[in-house]
Swiss-Prot record:
Belongs to the class-I aminoacyl-tRNA synthetase family. Glutamate--tRNA ligase type 1 subfamily. Signal peptide: none annotated. It comes from Chlorobium chlorochromatii (strain CaD3). PROSITE patterns: AA_TRNA_LIGASE_I. It comes from the Bacteria. Keywords: Aminoacyl-tRNA synthetase, ATP-binding, Cytoplasm, Ligase, Nucleotide-binding, Protein biosynthesis. It holds the Pfam family tRNA-synt_1c. Its EC number is 6.1.1.17. GO terms for molecular function: ATP binding; glutamate-tRNA ligase activity; tRNA binding; zinc ion binding. This is Glutamate--tRNA ligase.
Length: 502
């Protein structure tokens, strides 16, 4: 393998959504391949036809591409090692299985599901680790089953599977890039089914053959596959192939350190996309679930290119990684704060136009959908929103008249003379020829100070009548963005609708 071009792969099953753990696996494979100037391959492992979901393959690849994880070779992009869908490679697996049968590394097994379950229960009662009892291992391979009976079953067309013959009394050893040396006793390894009765290979068999034929140099996958490694290494040995280097990633855990699962929250990448998370934040987040740049490094926000430049498998830890939603939310806010106005506009404007189709506004459409107006809203609100869609959904008063006024805020901020003060302040605003935040603030101070009042007696009521809520960005800047005509109209409407709470 010395001098071999680095080639990694992500091999999902088309059984549904892309799990965040799957995204991390794909990302680490992609980052390592790109860092080493190698190739990243996507292969679809659909050997379990009963679990196949229509459209899942396309959705998986679409989600990966949304995240910026683009394959060099895949079902969509092709390549010299295809097909890249396992169900289209059945003749390849059959050929290699025949070779193992001829070399006495595999054998036919006619055990029924009932027999297998009975044997499993018996072993459990005896306190043994369940594994196949080798009833159908032929005499010529050290078993007790006569070859004549096996031929008779085959000629009768009875259903069978093909199992690998695990050598007795040996140790299977390998070096994991993340975990170091690992050793398994062959006594703990089951005679794995290689070919199922439907003619499809199992994952274990197909993945080994495909990884070799596709010239995969490094296998980077989740810790849950660690126990399968000795079976795979034996298959490489049976074929006389050199095994790829391997790295098994740490588990993803809930905050209570239980394994991340749908029972405790969203685990599908699509769920987070629907909630409004950006690809940059999600990729950044999953990259940090197990990897860090090193001691003393305080950087937490990384672009995909920065991750590519700095990633290394040696900096991936062994311990389980805690999936903390607060960290993802924090990252999303960092990206919004630092994203260019132009990029935010490209997202916010279509969202607003869509909202205006559902709910017309009395504000001039040309004004509130203009780049200059939306840019002002974005600059004012980018520190306060958590998602791009909140520039519309969390900031509705920039586009629509308040339909109501927050009762708690009115109760807290309204005084017996509030309506009178607001009405008297209208002429001060009308007199402003240049409706800027600075001029609005100066006018308010000039209005309240002679009365011996604090600014707050007007600031809070003004916010309520112009936005409908008791919180938000700088009042003066908000009023400037809304514009003189809108502000005056909303004050007058508020005076009609709000009275001193009882």
């Amino acid at each position: 393998m010395v001098g071999q071009r680095v080639r990694t792969r992500f091999a999902p099953s088309p059984t549904g959504y892309l799990h965040v753990g799957g995204l991390r696996t794909a990302l680490y494979n992609f980052l390592f391949a790109k860092k080493m100037k190698g190739d990243f391959i996507i292969r679809i492992e659909d050997t379990d036809q009963s679990r196949k979901v229509e459209g899942a393959q396309q959705n998986l690849i679409k989600t990966l591409e949304w995240a910026g994880i683009i394959a060099d070779e895949s079902p969509q992009h092709g390549g010299s090692c295809g097909p890249y869908i396992q169900s289209e490679r059945l003749d390849i697996y059959a050929k290699h299985c025949k070779q193992l049968l001829e070399d006495h590394h595999a054998y036919y097994c006619f055990a029924t599901p009932e027999e297998l379950e009975e044997n499993r229960q018996l072993q459990l009662k005896q306190g043994l680790q369940p594994k196949y009892n080798r009833k159908w291992l032929p005499e010529e391979m050290g078993g007790t089953m006569p070859e004549s009976l096996i031929r008779q079953k085959l000629e009768a067309g009875e259903p069978y599977v093909i199992r690998m013959k695990v050598p007795d009394y040996i140790s299977v050893w390998f070096e994991d890039i993340i975990r170091g040396p690992i050793e398994f006793d062959s006594a703990t390894i089951d005679d794995q089914v290689l070919m199922k009765s439907d003619g499809f290979p199992t994952y274990h068999f197909a993945s080994v053959i495909d990884d070799h034929l596709m010239e995969i140099s490094h296998i980077i996958r989740g810790e849950e596959w660690l126990s399968s490694m000795p079976k795979h290494l034996l298959l490489y040995e049976f074929f006389g192939w050199e095994a790829p280097k391997v790295a098994h990633l740490p588990l993803l855990l809930n905050p209570d350190r239980s394994k991340l699962s749908k029972r405790q929250g969203d685990v599908a990448v699509e769920d987070y996309i629907r909630k409004g998370y950006s690809s940059e934040a999600i990729v950044n987040f999953v990259a940090l679930l197990g990897w860090n740049e090193g001691e003393g490094c305080e950087q937490e926000v990384y672009s995909l290119q920065e991750l590519t430049d700095k990633f290394s498998l040696e900096r991936v830890g062994k311990a389980g990684s805690i999936f903390t939603l607060d960290k993802l939310k924090w990252l999303e806010k960092q990206y919004i704060k630092n994203r260019s106005v132009e990029k935010l506009l490209s997202v916010v404007k279509p969202l607003l136009l869509e909202e205006l189709e559902k709910k017309p506004s009395i504000m001039a459409r040309e004004q509130i959908t203009s780049d200059s107006y939306l840019s002002s809203v974005i600059e004012l609100m980018r520190e306060r929103v958590g998602f791009e869609h909140e520039f519309v959904t969390f900031s509705t008063y920039f586009y629509f008249e308040p339909e109501s006024y927050d009762e708690e805020s009115v109760k807290k901020r309204w005084q017996p003379n509030t309506n009178e003060l607001l009405a008297d302040f209208i002429p001060q605003l009308e007199a402003l020829s240049d409706f800027t935040a600075e001029n609005i603030e100066a006018a308010l101070k000039a209005f309240v100070e002679p009365k011996g009042m604090k600014n707050a007696v007007l600031i809070h009521p003004l916010r309520i009548v112009t936005s409908g809520v008791g919180f938000g960005p700088s009042l003066y800047h908000m009023l400037e963005v809304l514009g003189k005509e809108t502000v005056l109209r909303r004050i007058r409407k508020g005076l009609e609708c709000i009275t001193m709470p009882a």
